[in-house]
Amino acid sequence: MFNLLKQVSDYAKESIEAAKYIGQGLSVTFDHMRRRPVTVQYPYEKLIPSERFRGRIHFEFDKCIACEVCVRVCPINLPVVDWEFNKAVKKKELKHYSIDFGVCIFCGNCVEYCPTNCLSMTEEYELATYDRHELNYDNVALGRLPYKVTEDPMVTPLRELGYLPKGVLDPHDLPSGNQRSGKRPEEIIAESD
């Protein structure tokens, strides 16, 4: 009889301990449910890169003096610099410059050590292609400036979307003269602050 009571009390203690552990796990889950989402719905929402973001390299052909410092400081000797010596002026003339972004590690050494600042990092990070040879950018492709994330044609239409007014479940129930269905996300955030 005493052994049976001991087993029942042990079972009760273990049940209480299990419930405590489940409660701890659920408290963490509920804590995370109250937080704002960290992720974005890419490509419709894009985070604006930080100021020191190292994206695709921008190259200015006219500033380059073909010194090849960028090749020497690159850990993988990546930039290809073709030049010709002009005997009349006694200077190097740049003929061709290219970088293969399929191999580039975006360390930024070439940008930092360039004496004429003809190289700079941009905020462009969407370089994915179906053919790896398209990642080999020549001086023409490196020279074009990328568009800003805030001016992206995929993101811009989303700014015009609004929420339905409170209590309206179907957008067809709105009055015909109403141009926008509700408040924009920026307006809702401004009201809450």
UniProtKB/Swiss-Prot annotation:
It is a peripheral membrane protein. Gene3D superfamilies: 3.30.70.3270. It holds the Pfam family Fer4_7. Its cofactor is [4Fe-4S] cluster. InterPro entries: 4Fe4S_Fe-S-bd, 4Fe4S_Fe_S_CS, NADH_quinone_OxRdtase_chainI, NDHI. GO terms for molecular function: 4 iron, 4 sulfur cluster binding; iron ion binding; NADH dehydrogenase (ubiquinone) activity; quinone binding. Binds 2 [4Fe-4S] clusters per subunit. Keywords: 4Fe-4S, Iron, Iron-sulfur, Membrane, Metal-binding, NAD, NADP, Plastoquinone, Quinone, Repeat, Thylakoid, Translocase. Residues 169-193 are annotated as: Disordered. It is found in: Cellular thylakoid membrane. Belongs to the complex I 23 kDa subunit family. PANTHER family: NAD(P)H-QUINONE OXIDOREDUCTASE SUBUNIT I, CHLOROPLASTIC. NCBIfam families: ndhI, NuoI, PRK05888.1-3. NDH-1 shuttles electrons from an unknown electron donor, via FMN and iron-sulfur (Fe-S) centers, to quinones in the respiratory and/or the photosynthetic chain. The immediate electron acceptor for the enzyme in this species is believed to be plastoquinone. Couples the redox reaction to proton translocation, and thus conserves the redox energy in a proton gradient. This is NAD(P)H-quinone oxidoreductase subunit I. It comes from Rippkaea orientalis (strain PCC 8801 / RF-1) (Cyanothece sp. (strain PCC 8801)).
